Amino acid sequence: MLLEFTKMHGLGNDFVVLDLISQRAYLDTTTIQRMADRHFGIGFDQLLIVEPPDYPNVDFKYRIFNADGSEVEQCGNGVRCFARFVHERQLTKKTKIKVQTKAGIVEPELGPNGWVRVNMGYPKFMPHEIPFVTEEFEALYTLELANEQSLKIDVVNMGNPHAVTIVPDVLTADVATMGPQVESHVRFPQRVNAGFMQIVDEKHIRLRVFERGVGETLACGTGACAAAVSGMRRGLLANEVEVELAGGKLQIAWQEGDVVWMTGPTANVYEGRLDLRYFQS
């Protein structure tokens, strides 16, 4: 069985996008893992699936699978690519759409030259909303790591869980060691995305993210939102900031009590057809 797909990326955070409105397929965990293999498959950070919505006032259903085959609630870079994909594939003529995710409704809006602005919804901070295990709510939490190390973290849910820590320099931060420990820490029962943020000034941060189920990626849209919101609510950042990631830059805006806005680019890489029998054999 041949499936048409599109390879896209948002700041190097790369995706395979499948239209499962015009075509049909069943993809189990093993199949997705094989597709994600960068040597024997296509290779991607996440698989994005376009499906019909479950509700009449929504345009599309958006499903996201990590490279390890796990389904997740949200992907910020992915939703920008999703919006461009459905418009260019003529699945909709709208430039502003409502998209159903496991975390709720997001509203991307197409701009010029492949840029997309997205209403990412309201950030959540309560421990049970992350979820994060703690005896009481605090502004910052101490997370114990191996070898008697610890990190001061903030926790934010942007449709998916994030732990944010401030570092002096993202280039020298030991993301490879600390990232996996934070991601799978026992206090995060659903695992977590680990963000390492350097504050350059009140309108500019640098960020590295070790993503749950993927590892460190070149960019993470929800991670950029979580880091910016964390700094803003602590009075360390202005209400609009530029987030510099390895793959490029995002603009994040937020006012206390309001939704988070993310603006950034998208790119089409190539289109192709995959033989599903190869990945399921």
UniProtKB/Swiss-Prot annotation:
* Positions bearing the site annotation: Could be important to modulate the pK values of the two catalytic cysteine residues: H162, E211
The EC number on file is: 5.1.1.7
Q: Which domain of life is it from?
A: Bacteria
Q: Which UniProt keywords apply?
A: Amino-acid biosynthesis, Cytoplasm, Isomerase, Lysine biosynthesis
Named in its record, the pathway it takes part in is: Amino-acid biosynthesis; L-lysine biosynthesis via DAP pathway; DL-2,6-diaminopimelate from LL-2,6-diaminopimelate: step 1/1
Q: Where is this site: Important for dimerization?
A: Y270
Any single Pfam family the record assigns to this protein: DAP_epimerase
Instruction: Provide the binding site for substrate.
Output: N13, Q46, N66, G76, N77, N160, N193, E211, R212, G221, T222
- The answer to whether UniProt assigns keyword Isomerase to this entry is yes
Q: Name one GO biological process term.
A: lysine biosynthetic process via diaminopimelate
- Where do the catalytic residues lie? C75, C220
Q: Where in the cell is it found?
A: Cytoplasm
| MF term (GO), any | diaminopimelate epimerase activity
Any one GO cellular component localisation term in the record: cytosol
InterPro entries given in the database record? DAP_epimerase_AS, DAP_epimerase_DapF
Instruction: Give me the reactions it catalyses.
Output: (2S,6S)-2,6-diaminopimelate = meso-2,6-diaminopimelate
Which NCBIfam families does this one have?
Answer: DapF (TIGR00652)
Q: Which HAMAP family match?
A: DAP_epimerase (MF_00197)
Function of this protein?
A: Catalyzes the stereoinversion of LL-2,6-diaminopimelate (L,L-DAP) to meso-diaminopimelate (meso-DAP), a precursor of L-lysine and an essential component of the bacterial peptidoglycan.
Q: Which family does it belong to?
A: Belongs to the diaminopimelate epimerase family.
Quaternary structure, from the entry:
Homodimer.
Q: What is this protein called?
A: Diaminopimelate epimerase
Species the sequence originates in = Acinetobacter baylyi (strain ATCC 33305 / BD413 / ADP1)
Gene behind this protein: dapF
